[in-house]
């Protein structure tokens, strides 16, 4: 028997290695809009997770969102093919879950177009056919309603049989708000608040498999 009937995944830093893409995008954005400001790669990696519009409003307060967001979007799309990479064992793990009758899906703060492109780049578009982007849901993570949408889609009613997998504090808060278990991957250079207490800390997909499958 499996511990979960439905496993939902974050995207950036969880099923797709987008760290280099995020860093490169923000370096280019700063060069255009804040040329005197220098951010380290480590600082920029913390921008992975929170809704991008919130990050842009915080980092570029002198520019209206309707100017800075299209600039970010255009720059980032130009970096996808070269800078987004696969993580090891992701596809194999997802296929194993599916073969064991476990349903899988993605909930991300990316918009659906970028999410679909990311899935294609990391060769998961033939594995994941349910992906909720920011434009598919009433509000971005950590608002929990998208998990309710996913449960309804998969006809899952018991929240104790749902696991959300992410890589940062936002993902933990999201799962907690929804009342489902959370697994946090620790392989990225992330910082976690002391309140971040997922059911599972996992260093890779092998450990995730052990948590999900009995």
Show where each model-derived region lies:
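Short, acidic loop-to-helix structural element flanking the phosphoryl-transfer center
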Residues: 78-106, 112-116, 144
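N-terminal helical cap/lid subdomain that shapes the substrate entry/recognition surface
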Residues: 2-91, 96
């Amino acid at each position: 028997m499996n511990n979960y009937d439905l496993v939902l995944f974050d995207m950036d830093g969880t099923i797709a290695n987008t760290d280099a893409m995020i860093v490169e995008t923000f370096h280019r954005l700063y060069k255009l809009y804040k040329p005197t400001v220098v951010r380290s790669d480590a600082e920029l990696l913390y921008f992975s997770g929170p809704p991008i519009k919130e990050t842009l409003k915080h980092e570029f307060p002198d520019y209206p969102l309707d100017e800075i967001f299209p600039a970010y979007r255009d720059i980032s799309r130009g970096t996808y093919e070269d800078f987004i990479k696969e993580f090891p064992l992701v596809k194999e793990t997802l296929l194993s879950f599916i073969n064991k009758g476990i349903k899988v899906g993605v909930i991300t703060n990316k918009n659906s177009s970028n999410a679909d492109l990311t899935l294609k780049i990391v060769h998961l578009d033939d594995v994941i056919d349910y992906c909720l982007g920011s434009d598919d849901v009433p509000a971005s993570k950590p608002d929990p309603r998208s998990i309710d949408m996913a449960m309804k889609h998969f006809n899952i009613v018991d929240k104790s049989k749902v696991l959300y997998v992410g890589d940062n504090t936002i993902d933990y808060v999201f799962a907690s708000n929804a009342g489902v278990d959370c697994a946090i991957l620790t392989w990225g250079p992330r910082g976690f608040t002391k309140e971040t207490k997922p059911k599972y800390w996992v260093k890779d997909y092998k450990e995730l498999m052990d948590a999900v499958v009995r």
